[in-house]
Amino acid sequence: MADENPLVGFHFAVDIQGVIKGYFTECSGLGSEHEIIEHKVVTEKGQEIVMKIPGRLKWENIVLKRGITSNMDIWDWRKQVEDGGVDDARRDGSIIMFDQGLNEVARWNFEQAWPSKCSGPSPKADGNEIGIEELEIAHQYIKREK
């Protein structure tokens, strides 16, 4: 196995089919997990053991954060779901990670995504932080392609 340097996690882009194309400052939720079912059995020798078997597969929601701008793309997409149009709002998309030379080095593709939550900044009169907006995306499937 060739030695590879770990990837830097701050160069990434988001491409959601026809809705969002841009850069975010933070991304989480690129994974899945199985519920664990404990199955109690008795062996031929009378010993009780607990076998753990995979249960229902669950995909984590993708959470994206970025500095707020005048761009309304995530809010317009969320409004589509709020108005009852979740089927029309479903989109496929990708999270793309780049190396320091901006060459694509990793890609996660997800399917049938829709915005389950959208929130804006929490302004404070005495603060000087950049306002952050957050988008949470539910989806049917995600796979690391590269």
Regions found by a protein language model. Name each.
Residues 1-146:
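Glycine-rich, low-complexity intrinsically disordered segments
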